[in-house]
Amino acid sequence: MKKLLRALLLASLAALATLARAETLTVSAAASLTDALREIGPQFEAAHPGVEVRFNFGASGLLVQQLRQGAPVDLLLTADLASMDQAASLTLIRPETRIDFAGNVLVLIEAAKTAAPLRQLSDLSQPSVRRIAIGKPASVPAGRYAREVLEAAGLWDALQPKLVPADNVRQALDYVARGEVQAGFVYLSDAATQGDKLRVVQRFNVAVRYPGAVTQA
């Protein structure tokens, strides 16, 4: 999956960059794309002499806010359709350049070594689970997807005291990796960056799609 994501990103970045026609390409991208984009950045520059690429990572909702406030951005890559739809409604992007370039999977994770491993989503109600990392639903797509999953399971209200809000999906990942929480909601691609340190408890059937577009800047 990681190789496919990188290949898709490289191809999409090249296509969008051609449309943007910038010597210094500033890309605002969802936090879950951090590792993939940092890896392909040098490859892109090698294939496009004279073009320097700079990345700005964060929660998709925050990236749209930054763009609305005048941030100098050439390409916008979000982790959900809603954020890109918002950017389009605010005429912040060139709609004819919009493409869906990748997908992902929302997962529930925990530390690989734990005394009482979780087996399923409902186990989050157990007393042993005191803190659960989740992206802020208002600005973090992964958090919004997680809320939908919890609401569908009838767990959202009951788990409120345990939820630890994260500014982006990578912060939620870090909370789990550092042992500051017992579980967290992230994307499968994020969990994969931690090797065998973390364990995927459950995958969820949520349509996670990544759109990209050239901005109007």
Label for each model-derived stretch:
Residues 22-48, 52-57, 61, 65-69, ...:
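Exported/periplasmic ABC-transporter solute-binding proteins
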Residues 7-17:
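Bacterial N-terminal signal peptides
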Residues 1-6:
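Positively charged n-region of N-terminal signal peptides that target proteins for export
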